[in-house]
UniProtKB/Swiss-Prot annotation:
GO terms for molecular function: protein methyltransferase activity; protein-lysine N-methyltransferase activity. PANTHER family: ELECTRON TRANSFER FLAVOPROTEIN BETA SUBUNIT LYSINE METHYLTRANSFERASE (PTHR43648:SF1). Its EC number is 2.1.1.-. S-adenosyl-L-methionine binds at T152, G172, D194, N234. The keyword S-adenosyl-L-methionine applies. The keyword Metal-binding does not apply. Its main location: cytoplasm. This is Ribosomal protein L11 methyltransferase. It comes from Geobacter sulfurreducens (strain ATCC 51573 / DSM 12127 / PCA). Disulfide bonds: none annotated. NCBIfam families: prmA. Methylates ribosomal protein L11.
Amino acid sequence: MDKQWAEVCCQVPAGLVDLLADFLVELSGNGVSIDNRALDTFTLDGIEELDTATVRAYFDPATDMAGQIAQIERFLGDNAAAFGGAPIPAPTVTLIRDEDWATGWRQHFVPTRIGRHLVIKPTWEPFAPEPGDQVIELDPGMAFGTGTHPTTRLCLEALETLGRPDRVLDVGTGSGILAIAAVRLGARQVIGTDIDPDAVIVAGENCALNGVEVELVTTPLALIPGRFDVVLANILAEDLVRMAGDLAAKVAAGGHLILSGILTEREAFVVEGFGRSGLALVAVSREGEWSCLVYRNEG
Ligand SMILES: C[S@@+](CC[C@H](N)C(=O)[O-])C[C@H]1O[C@@H](n2cnc3c(N)ncnc32)[C@H](O)[C@@H]1O
């Protein structure tokens, strides 16, 4: 049977988060998680701080949960005054299965066909390719990009329709999935860049797994030399618009820019943001709540 955990959830003043997290790690002997805000950007510059945050801790349910909760309530009561004085809601306890907590995502990651010939295959799953299939083996680790997310899928579909590119730049490479696909589709030179050094390590492992050569860097976009036949950026609307000038400058004459990570409700915002980029919008595709825009440098 799957192991179970008692998930204790505390909503506390933002200033108390670090102190509480340390206390809960000590008390539970396990890690804690702090809920992320749903932001449309990877950059925190100019983002207003929230007043409260949610901290979750994980206990073995066989332990004395009533005793643990009493200790947590005492800790919250002792600290409430120092952090605004408002009463802190009582922690809630939910029983969850281990698979939900740590590795549940693996169940949903099965070999997936995308476009006509691309197949994304988890390293641990068997798969019998059909003639012409381009199989990408992947273990995303903690980096984003299994191909199961619509933003990645939309990018891969758009990339395949553009035929065989020569030079490709993958901005925000994550697991390296788009960069590897570009090589599989025949690109001669591919550069993948990410602001997250851990993502670059995972991307490197995935490139090695697939026997493909991709130059992986953490170099800021503006400092990457040259122009590319295809520039891919599956980031988020705010970031794409902020980077519009640098992204457009990297597209060679006759080349394409594929933008993804855009909630459809933010599509108009991105179209407007690229209005003065000098590129022409040539295709829009959508899946679920996500949009993907393809621009062309007509110059
Ligand atoms: C949504 S993931 C995309 C991963 C993968 N390319 C895919 O399509 O599945 C976005 C990635 O962009 C990276 N990122 C965010 N802002 C960036 C920036 N300004 N320059 C480069 N990478 C960035 C993040 O660290 C993250 O790995």
